[in-house]
Amino acid sequence: WKVQHNILHHTYTNITGHDEDIHPVGILRFSPNEKLKGIHRFQHLYAWFFYGLMTIQWLTTKDFRGLKRYNDMGFVKTGYKKEFIKLVFWKIIYLGYVLALPMIFVDNFSFIEIIVGFLSMHFIAGLILGLIFQPAHVMETSEFPMPNQDMTIENTWAVHQMNNTANFGNKNFFLNWYAGGLNFQI
């Protein structure tokens, strides 16, 4: 999270090839700088399903791939093996209290019901995260600058953030409460 969000996303917001938040699975396209494929014309129909899988992807693959990639980039300062063990440990703890404890101590639900509940919770969480985070950066007013030959962009970091971030639903009391203010990005 520190590397992916705080360093890469907030330093390189909406810069293709650097901001992982605008480079999802190949079937989705968030940046006009990404290659346009025929399937993308239906993205408005199927994106919701992939948003719903977001937290399952984090749990199963994204964190592991990210750790490897960030180690290769030199961001992992405490040692790859140590961070990998910590990552596996915390995923086991999470799965233990979210899946194993209910299976052991809750008699009212079957194994299948607990798994369906777990997957439903993750699907809804991913959908909510997608619905809150995408409007903050992937709007018609957002810019998607490409670095020049010197690997720089023309604006300062602060101006770049203002040009690539959007508030939404500012006057919607329920959305403000529900999103915890995440709809106020600027």
Go through the PLM ranges and name each one.
Residues 37, 80-84, 110, 137, ...:
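Intrinsic-disorder/low-complexity, polar/charged segments
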Residues 44-56, 79-132:
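Alpha-helical bilayer-embedded segments of polytopic membrane proteins, i.e.
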